[in-house]
A protein has these predicted regions:
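Surface-exposed binding/hinge segments that line
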Residues: 13, 130-195
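N-terminal lobe/hinge region of extracytoplasmic solute-binding protein
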Residues: 39-91, 127, 212-214
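Gly/Pro-rich hinge or "lid" segments in bacterial periplasmic/extracellular proteins
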Residues: 72-73, 153-154, 164-165, 175-241, ...
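Aromatic- and charge-enriched surface segment that lines or borders ligand/interaction sites
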Residues: 84-135, 168, 260, 307
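Periplasmic-binding protein-like
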Residues: 181-182, 304, 308-346, 392
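Ligand-site clamp/hinge motif
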Residues: 205-208, 233-279, 397, 410-412
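Structural transition elements
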Residues: 217, 337-370, 385-395
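Ligand/substrate-recognition segments at binding pockets and active sites
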Residues: 224, 346, 368-417
Length: 418
């Protein structure tokens, strides 16, 4: 059996099925509120962003941690974060970061910070993910997916602590997206002092379960699959948040989130069920915010095995799948067909690329040319969970399965672990 799957985009992949233009957030107008309840769609994996891969985890962690650099609100331009400025050498290989002074850490019942954020913490964030000798490399998990998928371990040649507030990173080669990579959620900075204290106490896992950050909120309480409670951090370097109490009410079912919103049990919810959109838009008490998502859903092939090592087979599969039918049936017109693995809201998106047409006759010919005139059998893995870019992976897989059967490809649907 050969294998291909429908999944999220953790890095550079070879094929895709749909980019989402989806209502990302909606809510009841809440003026000058001191408490906001957010109906989150799931529990975080943990409170260590370095090994997180889901939006729910990043949403939970982004309240707690700051990053060295950030993306501007609503865009992808890189702006200062914990680094107030930086310099790049003429050859594009040396980045010198000048860090903010006076950035405070959250308090913890087992740890009271004795110093502000400094270069040691930035270096700890990078070395924990990229240096196997770091004592925290394997704590919670050693699977630093984003860091590895971006090639950081091979890209970073050296990290130099120039002084308490200056860090110099030398790369093996120029890398245009390096700053953008550091602005992503996985690069949230943890306290090295806190990590050292918990390591000495024999409880290193506490760092990822009872987090200490420099972000706008500190964690008050977390009950898995139920609630996360945050409190605004008065000493946040960018100014105290306008909302005093932030509550994540974990609600996995989109229709239940909508019901809670209607009853006033939450003020904000993400990713409504497409079937509820008409009612949502007609409700005068609801404000709907939507834009093209910064994500894609895709169909990935295992190109190391036959027949997917042959581009003609991959092209045939792409031409055999009716993307419009998937968008109409699953996304209810809130998605758009993707023609490359970069979402349209990203700066490097190339709109000039032409997608393959839906043409099953041409797909059959390509299979025959590749030596598969009678088709073949394969596994089709689908996510068992709902994601913003894929609200019903099983249904999408079933639609793909039916399309592929028409060109002689027998696909058996299985569950992919994501």
């Amino acid at each position: 059996m050969n294998t291909f799957k429908s999944a999220p985009w953790p890095g550079a992949k070879r094929a895709l099925i749909a980019a989402i233009a989806f209502p990302a957030l909606l809510g009841i107008t809440c003026v000058s509120a001191k408490t906001i309840v957010f109906c989150s769609e799931g529990s975080p994996e943990n409170f260590y962003p370095g090994i997180n891969t889901t939006g729910t985890s990043f949403d939970a962690n982004s309240q707690i941690y700051s990053r060295i650099v950030d993306f501007e609100r609503g865009g992808t331009a890189v702006v200062p974060g914990l680094a107030e400025r930086w310099e790049i050498s003429a050859d594009g290989k040396v980045y010198t970061f000048y860090l903010r002074k006076g950035v405070k850490w959250h308090n913890h019942r087992d740890y009271k910070p004795t110093r502000d954020f400094n270069a040691d913490d930035m270096i700890f964030m990078l070395e924990r993910q990229g240096k196997e000798s770091n004592p925290y490399f394997k704590v919670t998990s050693s699977n630093h997916s984003y860091f590895n998928d971006m090639g950081m371990p091979k890209l970073i040649k050296s990290i130099e602590r120039v002084n308490d507030y200056t860090v110099k990173i030398t790369l093996e080669k120029p890398e245009a997206p390096f700053l953008s990579n550091l602005a992503m959620e996985y690069a949230g900075v943890q306290s090295k002092e806190y990590a050292d204290a918990m390591l000495k106490a024999g409880t290193p896992e506490k760092v990822d379960q009872e987090p200490v950050g420099t972000g706008p909120y500190y964690l008050v309480r977390y009950i898995k699959d139920a609630v996360i409670r945050y409190k605004a951090f008065p000493q946040y370097y960018a100014g105290k948040a306008k909302i005093d109490d932030l509550i994540f009410s974990i609600t996995t079912d989109a229709s239940v989130r909508w019901a809670k919103l209607q009853k006033g049990e939450c003020h904000v919810m993400p990713y409504p069920n497409p079937a509820d959109l008409d009612a949502i838009r007609k409700d005068p008490n609801i404000t709907v915010l939507e834009q093209a998502g910064l994500n894609v859903g895709y169909l990935a092939y295992n190109t190391t095995k036959k027949p997917f090592d042959d581009v003609r087979v991959r092209k045939a599969i792409n031409m055999a799948i009716n993307k419009k039918a998937i968008i109409d049936a699953v996304y209810l017109t809130t998605g758009v067909a993707a023609k490359n693995p970069i979402p349209p809201t990203q700066w490097s998106y190339n709109d000039a690329i032409k997608d393959d047409a839906y043409d099953q006759a041409a797909a059959k010919k390509l299979l025959a040319d590749a030596g598969y005139a009678n088709g073949f059998a394969t596994d089709l893995w689908a996510m068992p969970v709902q994601r913003p870019y894929n609200p019903n992976a099983r249904r999408i897989a079933e639609l793909m399965q039916a399309d592929l059967a028409k060109i002689g490809v027998t696909a058996e649907i299985g569950r992919a672990h994501v």
